[in-house]
């Protein structure tokens, strides 16, 4: 157990018996009241966001974790098969662990898997940005390229992304895996 004041963003704690990652932690001292920490956390089992107020003197159970890089190989049913780059061991990661960012997984991409002290998978950290090829989008006319609207595009992983009108089939784009938003076109 450690004091809440020693915990920072990105720490994984055991809260109400389940692992939670701290997404933000703010120390507050309002007027005549006692100080507290306002924490926004994400439950790593269910994916739900939780807000909680910890008193400044409260202790929490920090989970000892290990982060290891793994390479994505293929999808097997509802699991993703990942390979340890050093030992070549393969593990299956349930789709629910990756969440919505799994729609941008493509062969050979490197992810970081977070293991708890008992060896179970707590989280999978995707790269923030991935480069994917647009496989299908509606053709544009000269008038469309002059406007600043967006259109739907299907990328090589099967995900749909809103892209600017000038993007055509075969273009390579950079996408934010956290939000699924188009960032920029990549020069070939």
From Swiss-Prot:
Pathway: Protein biosynthesis; polypeptide chain elongation. Involved in peptide bond synthesis. Stimulates efficient translation and peptide-bond synthesis on native or reconstituted 70S ribosomes in vitro. Probably functions indirectly by altering the affinity of the ribosome for aminoacyl-tRNA, thus increasing their reactivity as acceptors for peptidyl transferase. Coiled coil: none annotated. This is Elongation factor P. Keywords: Cytoplasm, Elongation factor, Protein biosynthesis. InterPro entries: Elong-fact-P_C (IPR015365), NA-bd_OB-fold (IPR012340), Rib_uL2_dom2 (IPR014722), Transl_elong_fac_P/YeiP (IPR020599), Transl_elong_KOW-like (IPR013185), Transl_elong_P/YeiP_cen (IPR001059), Transl_elong_P/YeiP_CS (IPR013852), Transl_elongation_fac_P (IPR011768). PANTHER family: ELONGATION FACTOR P, ELONGATION FACTOR P (EF-P) FAMILY PROTEIN. One of its GO terms (biological process) is peptide biosynthetic process. The gene is efp. GO terms for cellular component: cytoplasm. The keyword Repressor does not apply. One of its GO terms (molecular function) is translation elongation factor activity. Its main location: cytoplasm. The keyword Protein biosynthesis applies. Belongs to the elongation factor P family. It is found in: Cytoplasm.
